[in-house]
């Protein structure tokens, strides 16, 4: 079990949670910061910034029947990001963590050539002083070191839904020390970062 009664669990949706018959009711299951699917908040002296990437296909793709408008959502978040990075709460934080579903940084066969989040937010996030970015989407664990693809911070991408590729990330902060540990389904450590 996750133990959400004792340990904070923060939910951020991915593209699959937007597509199914239950997606419309998903909002009723979670409290959203500022009633938006993206936002920022402090957890102790750590600033958590969560972004909503929307879908991984253009709004005009036939599967959406003209019902999606994630382009405007991403544009709104670009404005939010500029304000957030300039905010007192962000600047005062001892650590800053970025969380979003689709990786903005990273290259190779696992990364989509269509990446509107990188187009919209990449220039804003390139120099941002985050300790780490936590992502998913590719269904394969990856570690992108700081500076490998224009990223100013390490990027950790979680694994997939199958047991042979599944991962769990444990972000922990004690005092001034922050660590991120990535485990596979066997409980083996794939990566441990001192942030």
Q: Where are the regions that the model predicts?
A:
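Charged helix-capping and loop-helix junction motifs
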Residues: 113-120
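A general structural motif
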Residues: 6, 92-95, 130, 177
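A cross-taxa feature marking solvent-exposed loop/turn segments within ectodomains of secreted
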Residues: 91, 163-164, 188
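Histidine-centered catalytic micro-motifs
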Residues: 98-105, 131-141
């Amino acid at each position: 079990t996750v133990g959400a009664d004792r340990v904070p669990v923060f939910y951020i949706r991915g593209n699959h949670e937007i597509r199914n018959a239950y997606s419309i009711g998903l909002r009723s299951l979670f409290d959203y910061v500022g009633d938006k699917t993206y936002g920022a908040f402090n957890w102790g002296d750590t600033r958590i910034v969560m972004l909503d990437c929307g879908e991984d296909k253009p709004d005009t793709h036939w599967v959406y029947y003209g019902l999606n408008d994630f382009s405007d959502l991403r544009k709104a978040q670009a404005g939010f990001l500029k304000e957030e990075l300039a905010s007192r709460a962000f600047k005062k934080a001892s650590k800053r963590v970025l969380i979003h579903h689709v990786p903005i940084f990273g290259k190779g066969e696992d990364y989509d050539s269509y990446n509107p989040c990188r187009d919209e937010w990449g220039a804003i996030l390139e120099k941002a002083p985050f300790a780490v970015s936590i992502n998913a989407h590719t269904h394969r664990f990856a570690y992108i070191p700081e500076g490998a693809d224009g990223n100013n911070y390490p990027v950790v991408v979680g694994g997939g839904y199958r047991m042979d590729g599944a991962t769990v990330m444990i972000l922990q902060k004690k005092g001034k020390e922050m660590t991120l540990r990535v485990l596979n389904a066997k409980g083996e450590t794939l990566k441990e970062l001192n942030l």
